[in-house]
Structures are given as structure tokens and as C-alpha cells.
A protein has these predicted regions:
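Conserved interdomain linker/interface between the two RecA-like ATPase lobes of SF2 helicase motors
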Residues: 5-76
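Long, largely alpha-helical accessory region at the distal end of helicase-like NTP-driven motors
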Residues: 63-67, 71-72, 78, 189-319, ...
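Conserved segment of the helicase C-terminal RecA-like domain
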Residues: 150-155, 159-190
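Conserved helicase ATPase core of P-loop NTP-dependent helicases/translocases
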Residues: 83-87, 94-129
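Compact mixed alphabeta submodule
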Residues: 523-542
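Charge-dense, extended regions
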Residues: 341-460, 468
């Protein structure tokens, strides 16, 4: 259709539109052999052991089906596993048969009819039912294999989603082992292609009712296996990025821009820049597309700066100012404040000063100055903001102009994730926090450590790594603990007493108005960004 998408619908949307049969998904723990969970390297004898067969039988009988007659598909990792498991399940009274690509089409159709007629309870297979063959009466789908791709996962799950008068819902039982690809499960179930680890963790933690009767449930151990896979997988590796880029490029029939990845629910564009190969989107296009974008070093540098500083969209102010400057060349400070008021954003002097610091590059710490230089992107003269003349010259290059505007548009789109300057449940780096608390200069993480008081803004962010690495020094292995949903037991830095100036300032925060904000990360493996949990007040007499 000349690259106009005629119709595309995600699993969740199809369920909401009553186009598919609802399903109840159970992610269950696979068995352990000699204390180790089944994984990609498990041999056929372990996959078909009597212990595993009993485990499978226990789960498929426990979770059952919506009526008394099972019509199930069991997806296995190999033909040998399918055949051997079929034999063993039959020995336990089940009526099953293995079907593989080796069987001719007439035989397959005969076996499918036996399942539909109730002569069989289960067909075991590897991938011949991924697509193309529908058995509307299937009411249970069992997955005994590693998830190879989110597309295949949905195809296999979908074998049971055709509506049929004999069923109200389909039971999906997914046996989750110690698989590297477990991170694909939330991508498939929730239709989330963002490659944003925090999104996936959030989706797994929250109660999941996709639509109507459709629910997603995980045994705790199975859920932990997925969390582990999410943590250990580099979602910004070149193959994942290339697949995401080319998938959208093929869909659109043109070069996708950053904003396209967002509006078409593709990869979160931030993930491209988690890969050190890419400093700006021109690098991405030149790597993955046949199109060639030529930028001067100056153009590339400015594009890299706004990508680094503004694309995450954690504060709208800078983006709005740049958007106005691109339109009109200059804007008065009064006009900028008027724009902020229209957007219902704060116009405090401290925030305006912080915005000016960021766009003049004064906020950068020394290592970033080496990368981006000291030339301001925006200047303020006689209460009028102007774009650097060097940047204005760059706009003569249409590719630069397109890419620069794209960063602004994508950054503004991403600000929707941050309705407040600090949004509870969202993640922030120490650098983000310094900027959003309006500190005049970014502080190196080592200077901040677990907390730092900024006298100019009267603020003190507190950063806690909840599970400490065993290898860190005992002197900084603080025993911070959340006692309940509203109370934190917190330790000051090492070698402090109640008379230490920073401790006294924190204790006296109810009187001195010190703004205490809490940021927590589970452990160092989750990266350098912390979840914002809210403001802190001192519990009296503690």
C-alpha cells in the first residue's frame, strides 16, 4: 500500500476489541536438575526425565482448562523432546502425539482432527503450528521451550486465541527456566518494544490484567528469572538496535526519525545512545541505513550535545526555549516565561537560572567540557535569548536542521513520562538530580556518594543502593533499610557524629527547610539511575 500501513493491531488491542479469545497466562518455574534450573544447554535426558514429566503433569492439571475436555498444544525445544515426552505423557494416562515437520500434510490434518474430536488431548510439536494452521477449539497452550523471539512467542500463544463456542478463555502455561532470552517474555506479552529495562521491570511488578478476563501471572521464582535476564542482557547491542531500526524503516518505507520510534511504539530512542558507538542520530542512520548523512565536526558536536542533554525529556523548559528560538531566532526572557506559564510549568528564578546554565554549557563538568567545549548553545543579552551564531550557520545544512528539530520533538514527546520535575517511580541519575534541583554545576558521582547538601539551593538528595555488593568496603556498606512503606532507617556517611555539620543540617531540616529527596536502586547491576521515591522528613526523637 505504498508504505501506508493499512491495518496493524497489537495483541492487547486485539483483546480489547474482542477480536480474540481471552487468555490466562501462568509463568511457572521449570524443574531443577542437581540444583540448577533447566537452561539452553540442558540435554535431552534432563528435558524428558521422569522428574520433569511429573512436574509438567502437575502444572497442566493444576491450572487446567475452562471446561472438562483438554485440547492442548505443547511446544517443545526439539523433535526428540516432543517424541519422548509424548511417549512418557501417554504412560501417565494422557492421550498425546508428537507432530513434526517430518510428517506429511495429510497426516497432520488427520491428527488435528483427532484433537478437535476429543480423541487426543495434546499435540506436541516444535514449530509447525507457529502460524498458518488454526485449531479454534484449542484451550490450553504449554510452552516448554526457550523463547527465541517475541514474534514466535506471540505466534505460539496465538494458536489458542481463536474464538470457539467451547471455551471462554485459554490457559497458557509457560515453563520458565534459566534462559538468557527470558527478557523477551514481557516484550511479547505486553507488546512493549521499547527495549527499556525499567519499563519491563515495572510491567512485571504491577498486577497485570491485559483486558477483561485476560491476566498475566508469574510464580515468584519464575519472575526472578525474567528479572535476572533483563538485568544481564545488553538491550543496546548492535543486533537488537539494527533489528529495531530496520523493522521500522521497512514499515515506513523511509528513514525513521527519533520521533517515529516513539509514535510507532518502537524502540525507546534513548537505547540507541546507550551504545557507545552512537553519539547522535546521524551515526545511527549512517550505520543502519543506505542513506548517508554528512555533518561537519561542529554540526556533529552540537547534535551530540542536545541528544545527550535534552533527548531524555526530564525537563521541558530547555526544549521549549530551543523550539521557540528555532522558530524566531530570538526570544525575550519575558516571552519565555509567558510560554512556561501557558504550559503550566514553574517559572522560579532558580529554575530559569538552571536552564540558562544548561544551555550555556556552564553546568557541564570538566570531562563533558572536553567533549562538547565551552561555547554556549544559547546566550542571554539584555534579557533576550539568542542561538549561538555558529549553530545558526549549521542550520543551513538541511540534514542538520532536520536532525536537530527531531531531537527537540522527540524530547518533548518524552516529557510526557515526567509530569512533575521529580515523578515518583521514575528513574534519575545523580547528574539528572543535580540539574533538576537547579544546582549551578554538575557534581562528579564520587563527590556526592550517598548524599550531598547544596547550600545555594538548600537541597539534599539521598541515594541508596539497597543491596550492597559483597566486595565493597565494610566502611561504606551501610545498613539502610525500608522498615515499611513510609519509614526508612538511614545511615550517614562514615566517620560522622551527631555533631558533624552535614548530619546536624539534615537532623534540623524541619527548622531549616532543607529539601530531602530519596532515590533508591536495588543493586549496582541495575545501572546508574535511581528510582525517585519521594520527599523525606525526619521522624522526631529517632
Amino acid at each position: 500500500f505504498d508504505y501506508n500501513i493499512a491495518y496493524e493491531i497489537r495483541l492487547q488491542d486485539a483483546l480489547e476489541n474482542d477480536m480474540l479469545c481471552p487468555f490466562v497466562y501462568f509463568g511457572v518455574k521449570d524443574i531443577e536438575i542437581d540444583g540448577k534450573l533447566i537452561d539452553e544447554k540442558s540435554n535431552i535426558s534432563n528435558l524428558t526425565s521422569d522428574e520433569r514429566v511429573k512436574h509438567i503433569l502437575n502444572k497442566i492439571d493444576f491450572y487446567g482448562v475452562c471446561n472438562n475436555q483438554v485440547r492442548g498444544l505443547i511446544f517443545c525445544s526439539s523433535k526428540a523432546e516432543a517424541r519422548e515426552l509424548s511417549i512418557k505423557l501417554n504412560q501417565h494416562g494422557k492421550r498425546t502425539i508428537a507432530l513434526t515437520g517430518d510428517d506429511d500434510i495429510n497426516y497432520r490434518e488427520k491428527i488435528v482432527k483427532q484433537l478437535e474430536d476429543g480423541e487426543l488431548e495434546y499435540i506436541l510439536t516444535v514449530d509447525i503450528f507457529n502460524e498458518g494452521i488454526d485449531i479454534p477449539s484449542v484451550n490450553q497452550v504449554v510452552m516448554l521451550r526457550n523463547t527465541q523471539s517475541s514474534i514466535i512467542f506471540v505466534q505460539q500463544l496465538g494458536r489458542g486465541l481463536r474464538k470457539h463456542k467451547s471455551k471462554d478463555y485459554v490457559t497458557i502455561i509457560d515453563f520458565i527456566g534459566n534462559y538468557k532470552n527470558n527478557y523477551l517474555i514481557p516484550i511479547a506479552l505486553f507488546g512493549d518494544k521499547s527495549m527499556n529495562k525499567d519499563n519491563y521491570r515495572r510491567e512485571l511488578r504491577e498486577p497485570n490484567i491485559l483486558s477483561g478476563l485476560t491476566t498475566v501471572n508469574f510464580e515468584e521464582v519464575a519472575k526472578e528469572q525474567i528479572f535476572k535476564s533483563i538485568t544481564n542482557t545488553v538491550l543496546s547491542n548492535m543486533k537488537i538496535l539494527k533489528d529495531a531500526y530496520t523493522d521500522l524503516e521497512n514499515k515506513l518505507g523511509r528513514t525513521p526519525m527519533l520521533i517515529d520510534h516513539l509514535t510507532f511504539d518502537n524502540i525507546d530512542p534513548i537505547v540507541f545512545f546507550n551504545n557507545n558507538s552512537f553519539k547522535n542520530y546521524a551515526d545511527v542512520i549512517n550505520k543502519f541505513s543506505n542513506k548517508s548523512i554528512e555533518l561537519t565536526d561542529t554540526e556533529s558536536n552540537w547534535l551530540s550535545f542536545i541528544t545527550f542533554e535534552l533527548l531524555p525529556g526530564k525537563r521541558k523548559h530547555e526544549l521549549l526555549l530551543l523550539q521557540e528560538l528555532i522558530k524566531n531566532g530570538e526570544v525575550s526572557k519575558d516571552k519565555f516565561i509567558e510560554i512556561l506559564e501557558t504550559e503550566q510549568l514553574s517559572t522560579k528564578d532558580s529554575i530559569i537560572s538552571s536552564v540558562e546554565n544548561v544551555l550555556s554549557l556552564q553546568f557541564l563538568k570538566s570531562q563533558e567540557v572536553k567533549k562538547f567545549g565551552t561555547e554556549p548553545l544559547v546566550t542571554l543579552e539584555k534579557n533576550v535569548y539568542k542561538l549561538n551564531s555558529e549553530v545558526l550557520d549549521c542550520f543551513k545544512n538541511s540534514d542538520f536542521a532536520l536532525l536537530f528539530n527531531d531531537v527537540i520533538e522527540a524530547g518533548l514527546y518524552k516529557t510526557n513520562d515526567y509530569p512533575e520535575i521529580f515523578t515518583i517511580g521514575q528513574k534519575y541519575s545523580r547528574r539528572d538530580v543535580c540539574k533538576l534541583l537547579n544546582w549551578s554545576k554538575d557534581e562528579p558521582p564520587l563527590n556526592i556518594g550517598g548524599y550531598k547538601i547544596d547550600k545555594n539551593t538548600n537541597t539534599c538528595p539521598i541515594f541508596i543502593t539497597y543491596h550492597k555488593d559483597d566486595e565493597i568496603s565494610d566502611t561504606i556498606k551501610y545498613e539502610d533499610e525500608l522498615l515499611n512503606e513510609t519509614t526508612l532507617k538511614w545511615f550517614s556517611k562514615n566517620k560522622r557524629t551527631l555533631d558533624s555539620p552535614d548530619v546536624k543540617t539534615i537532623i534540623n531540616s524541619p527548622e531549616n527547610g532543607l529539601d530531602l529527596k530519596l532515590f533508591i536502586i536495588k543493586d549496582d547491576a541495575e545501572g546508574g539511575d535511581f528510582y525517585y521515591l519521594g520527599d523525606l522528613t525526619i521522624v522526631p526523637s529517632t
